[in-house]
Amino acid sequence: KNAGLNPVIIDVKCFALKSAVDQSNQLTNRPDDANLTAVLEFGLDENYLMILYDNNPIITDIFIRGQDRKILLDSQDAEEKEGLVRRYVTQVKQAIQDFETKYEKRIRNIKVVSDINKIEEYLGSFRKSLLNVGFNTFDPTEGLKIPSQFQQTLDSKNDRSFLSTAVGLAFRKLDVFG
């Protein structure tokens, strides 16, 4: 409203993210992502592992404590960060094991979406804790044609995962006029 816009669509963030991932998988045409993609939302507000299997989302919440949010925001203490990573990865590992046991499919890579500034630092710790799983930030713009006036701004961003919700909403096939 402050920007002079009237919202028309209210959506659930994880489904907008699913839409962005589906679109990315379609554009990049990677056979390994065709019917099994794991996406981790790692942030201050939302934390969950979403496994997209045969176009169905399987979502597992990842819980973090209030003090863990403070650690994510501004802690420089390596021991605090290690504790947070240990608690977090334990939950991610359990969600992966539950899926792999039920569906007999292996998860090798996880696309990460995050609003955390030092995401690469945390991904390095995740990789050390779960050796058989790759963690990479999700780039929802991969495969998209970006207008030249925006390309330079986009190129300056190491982590483009923050655009996932916006890209996902743009690709949602919703009939807003009913």
What are the residue ranges of the model-derived segments?
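Hydrophobic/aromatic-enriched cytosolic interaction surfaces used to assemble or bind macromolecules
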Residues: 1-178
